[in-house]
Amino acid sequence: MTITTINIPSLTPHPCVEYWSVCKVEALFETPFLELVYQAAQVHRKHFNPQTIQLSTLMSIKTGGCPEDCSYCPQSARYHTGVQNQQLLCVEEIVEKAKIAKSRGAGRFCMGAAWRGPKPKDIGKITEIIKAVKDLGLETCGTFGLLQDGMAEELKEAGLDYYNHNIDTAPEHYKEIIGTRDFDDRLNTLGKIRKAGLKVCCGGIVGMNETRKERAGLIASLANLDPQPESVPINQLVKVEGTPLADAQELDWTEFVRTIAVARITMPKSYVRLSAGRQGMSEEMQAMCFMAGANSIFYGDKLLVTVNPEEDGDQLLMAKLDLKPET
């Protein structure tokens, strides 16, 4: 199958959208911490109810054996991380997990497959899975890697609501993290997703030895997507033994909160998801993230192959903070 590059105005100014230069975003990062959180909270309240939170559950439907060399990922076939490879799960098993997620309050069911990208033969089964989960009354999101021509349209027709395709890190830092694809590969698939009419879930990871300027570059790249992503997951690196980033320098908690706040200010109408890494965050840190504009979490004890807070703990935290699930 021939893959045609789609030209998309991803990182160019738009007359109806504020253009965020890296310098401008970096200046936001330099704002005194409490003032930055306050500004982000004000922006958040203009566009969202600050006392509701969107709950998503993420399930790995095909695990391990990925040919990519992403330095953060325990599912890469290039690293010895103890992850057990698992082929694409059957529809029935996925539907059972989706039913449990719905019964526990999740409104969106996200499915991830460890591929560079799906092959044409995989799409038939994926569309069957999407239809079955949609029949439960859940929103659906898929993260299956780089898409070939026509695949996004097939996923849309099956009922997929969101496609997750993170840009990972700033363009300037990309080759330090991934060598088997480049930044433009991600933009190409994002263009196909938009063209098919799917909603975009697109974010990145912080704590991968990047500089603050490179964190600003990540946020600027996301904020200048046209249109901006409906959902922006901000992940804190989960360091896994066996991956090249297992010994990455620890990111100070205030810097992570700053990243959430800057994402909220630059993407005021997007859901900002407090994503991977929550297991290592205190309740106080998570509360600061919600104050700074995060209004979505992954809900469930596992994120693909890494640990996530258990539902009971999240319910308790939400009760303490008077947060209610979005309906």
UniProtKB/Swiss-Prot annotation:
Residues 51-278 form the Radical SAM core domain. InterPro entries: Aldolase_TIM (IPR013785), BATS_dom (IPR010722), Biotin_synth/BioAB (IPR002684), Biotin_synthase (IPR024177), Elp3/MiaA/NifB-like_rSAM (IPR006638), rSAM (IPR007197). Binds 1 [4Fe-4S] cluster. The cluster is coordinated with 3 cysteines and an exchangeable S-adenosyl-L-methionine. Binds 1 [2Fe-2S] cluster. The cluster is coordinated with 3 cysteines and 1 arginine. This is Biotin synthase. SMART domains: BATS, Elp3. It comes from the Bacteria. It is an enzyme of class 2 (transferase).
